[in-house]
Amino acid sequence: MSIATVQAVIDGQTYPLTLSDDGYYTLKGTAPALSSANEPGGYYGVQIIATDNAGNETTIDQDDSTWGAQLCLQAYESTKPTVTITYPSNDGRINTCTPAITAQLRDNDSGIDPATLDLRINNGSKITQGAPGLILTQVEGGYDLSYAVPDALPEGSTTISIGVSDRDGNAADPVSITCTIAVTAPTISLSSPAEGLVTNQAAVQIAGITSDDQLTSVTLTVTVNGHDQGPVTVDGQTGAFALTANPEHMQEGSNTIKVKVVDATGLEAEITRTVTLDTNPPRIVEVIGVTDRVHVGAPFTIRIKVED
């Protein structure tokens, strides 16, 4: 009897082998489109089926004790995984010294190898899978990373870098961001008006100074009895500001003036002044004067009753 067919089954596909002049049946195939990294054992098992003309069949595969090691097809891919740091943002400002760093680790073929994770803060020690505060959540296409920084970072510039490889050893391009940590709130002081000021002028002058490590990014708002006084310009060098209250927003009697400053990280400071507007002149309601003649050099008395 002679051999009728020799076939190979790889990843569910059947391929015929061709008899060569040297007596070997040969398959010159193309590896599967995806990496074998996620297959059991990390390879595609190859099943060989030999059939003779009488219909007798012999089958061996990767589990064969003699030839199994020759029937393990390892396929690898060469596309780099990607890393995206989602928080903090590059050039951003945050108001906590213990931020929760988040990132997306993605690879659409062999898959992210979490054991290769390399997270560093300010070029410090390598933070890897299993570190306290580090959570890797498996999602479609990779992992979502979350890292709760356990020890307070200093205020100022902070650099965060993340690297990772896939299961075929392809390393992602290095990714890093630089952000600014600012946890000290801005300050504000008023030189005008004085607390408790009593005035007959509705156009009250409001002036003061605010301080912050990034004055050009602060937002300052002024309200009079809850009415916004419009945009306020802050000197980017000195922090000084000045404006005049809208007279229409001042009321007779007690008035509340609030000045609030908010920096780029959302930290804020506020100061309040109470000003009394009194535009009503006093009323003279009674005069008890001198009705008799008074000798020169002699004392006299005039009594006035005044209301306000």
Q: What do these predicted regions represent?
A:
Residues 1-3, 107-114, 211-218, 308:
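Extracellular acidic loop/turn motifs
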Residues 14-21, 128-136, 229-236:
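Short, surface-exposed loop motifs enriched in S/T, G, D/E and P with embedded aromatic residues
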Residues 21-33, 137-147, 236-244:
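Aromatic sugar-binding surface patches on proteins
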Residues 32-43, 149-157, 246-254:
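Surface-exposed, short loops/turns at beta-strand junctions within beta-sandwich domains
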Residues 52, 65-84, 177-189, 273-282:
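Flexible, low-complexity linkers/stalks enriched in Thr/Pro that connect modular domains
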Residues 57-70, 171-177, 267-272:
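Extracellular and select intracellular beta-sandwich modules with Ser/Thr-enriched
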Residues 91-97, 195-202, 292-298:
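Short, solvent-exposed loop/linker segments at the N-terminal edge
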